[in-house]
Structures are given as C-alpha cells and as structure tokens.
C-alpha cells in the first residue's frame, strides 16, 4: 500500500526532455538547468543502439520468467552479481520487486549467465552515454574538462547495473483478490530514496511507475518512454557541485496487472576516490563549502548502513541549514 501525505501531480509536469542531437552548447546548458531545478531529465537521440537495448530487455525478460528456484540459485557468495527478491539492502527495506545486480567491472559472471554478452554490450553503451552527459555537464558549469567523467572512466570505478522486475499484482495478491475493491493494486515497488553514486542512467519498458519528488515535495509521475533514457543526479554530484545540483528523491510504484522492467546504470567512482565540492563551484557560488571531503568507500559504507528514505548527505555536511 502507498503511504505518505505527498500529493501526486500531473504526469511529466516540468520534467525536461533533452535532445542530445542538438548543438553541443545548447545541450550542456539544458542539462545544467535540469540538474539545478529537479535533478532529473530524459534524453532522446542518445546514440545507444536499439539492438543493444532490445537484446538487454529480452534477455532480462527471459531470466525473470524462469522458475523461482532457478533464479534464487543466482546468489553466489563473493561474486559481482546476485539475484534478490523483495529485500532491498541490508537494513530491512523491502518492495514488490525482484532484481539482478551486477558489478560492471568484474567479468566473473560471463561464464555463468547466458545473457552475459547482452549485459556487457549494454553496460558499455550506457557507460559511454553517462560519460558524455557528465562531460556536457562540466562544460555547462565551466569547470575543468572531465572533472566528473574521469571518476567513472577509471578501471577501478565502482559502478553497478541493476535490472528491476516489478511483477503484476496477481503474483502478490492472487487472481481471486484482484476483483476485491478493498485491495489496492497500487503498491510501493521500490521505496523513496536518492541514489548515492554520481549519476544514474535508467531505461524502462512501456509500463509506468517511476515518480520523482519536485521542489514543492510533490510526486511527479514519469511517463514511460522505451526510446528515452531517464537521468538523475546522485548524491556525489550534489556534493561536487556544492549543492547546486539536486540529488532527486524518487520511488517506483506498481499498478494493476502489467509487469514493469527497468534497467539502471549507477555511475560510481573508485572506492578510494576523494569526493568533495569542486573549488570552482565554491568560488562561483555565494555560499560556503557545504560538504566535507570523503572517499566514496567511506560514504558508501555509511550510506548503506541507513534505511532507504534516510538523508545520507546530512552526515557529511560542514554546516547545518
């Protein structure tokens, strides 16, 4: 059941759609504006090959269609991939979701998952898109080139790919209950949170469910567009821009009898990378340095010790609002 008092506003209200085929300076300005105002936008004409997208989606569908015992067997210890069902993190958060989680830099899964080729091609494509968006961001902010993209280009980058499958309601309630008016078919598939990494590049099938929180604290439903990628600012990018960009709070709901599939690339830096406000961002903004300097490993450890909805960045502020 969906809880909370936040009001839901119209679908796609104020969500920027950025055409990556436009003139470069125009694209960079639009990205900066979107990151400042909402921390979320869609990109079209992004250059990711449709064959790569389709292969990834079909192989994911094939995997989640397997019997439960086969899927649950993909939970090896100390491996860069795993299957999960309902459990989100290690602190009691749960949702109406099953997922596959891959560490993008370790090839150990290649011989064990039948769709490894599709996964590898997809990772390379969205990683390149993330780097391009981050370089355009740096240009729009007038900070040194590759200030952001260098962190995810390293061979040691701690990026992950997560494939979420939100099954139809009858798998949770049973077909007999679907006609019961007292049973709400709208559930929280993945609870309210921000992403701790630098940037997230997400694509979903034609089924809705994603919502983002705007500056008024209202939920904006994002219409599904399989031809576009959704991009959102993560906690680390908010820190590096000294709070100029917004790490947007978002969640996923499940509706009715349709199955939703989403694939998210979380662009993260190496564990030892030092993260803090860029000097150029502190000098150009009329406010003090808002965040301490820390390593991604330190932040990741602290962040994952909290619940999904907790405000992780508060632990690393240098001054209180």
From Swiss-Prot:
Function field: Catalyzes the 2-beta-hydroxylation of several biologically active gibberellins, leading to the homeostatic regulation of their endogenous level. Catabolism of gibberellins (GAs) plays a central role in plant development. Converts GA9/GA20 to GA51/GA29 and GA4/GA1 to GA34/GA8.
Name listed for the protein in its UniProt record: Gibberellin 2-beta-dioxygenase 4
Tissue-by-tissue expression: Expressed at the base of the shoot apical meristem and developing leaf primordia.
InterPro entries, sorted: DIOX_N, IPNS-like_FE2OG_OXY, IPNS-like_sf, Iron_ascorbate_oxido_reductase, Oxoglu/Fe-dep_dioxygenase_dom
Keyword set, alphabetical order: Dioxygenase, Iron, Metal-binding, Oxidoreductase
EC class: oxidoreductase
Recorded GO MF terms: gibberellin 2-beta-dioxygenase activity; metal ion binding
Catalytically driven reaction(s): gibberellin A1 + 2-oxoglutarate + O2 = gibberellin A8 + succinate + CO2
Cofactor binding notes: Binds 1 Fe(2+) ion per subunit.
Family (UniProt): Belongs to the iron/ascorbate-dependent oxidoreductase family. GA2OX subfamily.
Cofactor(s) required for function per UniProt: Fe(2+)
Pfam families for the chain: 2OG-FeII_Oxy (PF03171), DIOX_N (PF14226)
Native source species: Arabidopsis thaliana (Mouse-ear cress)
Fe2OG dioxygenase domain segment(s): 156-269
């Amino acid at each position: 059941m969906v809880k909370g008092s936040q009001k839901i506003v119209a679908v796609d209200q104020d969500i920027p759609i950025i055409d990556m085929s436009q003139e470069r300076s125009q694209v960079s300005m639009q990205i900066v504006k979107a990151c400042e105002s909402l921390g979320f936008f869609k990109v079209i004409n992004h250059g990711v090959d449709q064959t790569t997208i389709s292969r990834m989606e079909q192989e994911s569908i094939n995997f989640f269609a397997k019997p439960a015992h086969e899927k649950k067997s993909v939970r090896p210890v100390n491996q860069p991939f795993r299957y999960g069902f309902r459990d989100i993190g290690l602190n009691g958060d749960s949702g109406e979701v099953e997922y596959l989680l891959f560490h993008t830099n370790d090839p150990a899964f290649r011989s064990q998952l039948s769709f490894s080729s599709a996964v590898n091609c997809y990772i390379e494509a969205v990683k390149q898109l993330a780097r391009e968006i981050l370089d355009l961001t740096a240009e729009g902010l007038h900070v040194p080139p590759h200030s952001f993209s260098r962190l995810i280009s390293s061979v040691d980058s701690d990026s992950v790919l997560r494939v979420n499958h939100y099954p139809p309601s009858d798998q949770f309630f049973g077909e007999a209950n679907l006609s019961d008016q007292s049973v709400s078919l709208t559930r929280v598939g993945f609870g309210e949170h921000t992403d701790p990494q630098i940037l997230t590049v997400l694509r979903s099938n034609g089924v809705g469910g994603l919502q983002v929180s705007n500056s008024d604290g209202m939920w904006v439903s994002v219409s599904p567009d399989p031809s576009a990628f959704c991009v959102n600012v993560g906690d680390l990018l908010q820190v590096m821009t000294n709070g100029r960009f917004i790490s947007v709070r978002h969640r996923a709901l499940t509706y009715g009898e349709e199955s939703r599939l989403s694939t998210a690339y979380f662009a993260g830096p190496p564990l030892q990378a030092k993260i803090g406000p860029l000097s150029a961002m502190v000098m150009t903004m009329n406010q003090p340095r808002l965040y301490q300097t820390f390593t991604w490993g330190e932040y990741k450890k602290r962040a994952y010790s909290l619940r999904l909805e907790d405000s992780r960045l508060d632990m690393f502020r240098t001054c209180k609002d």
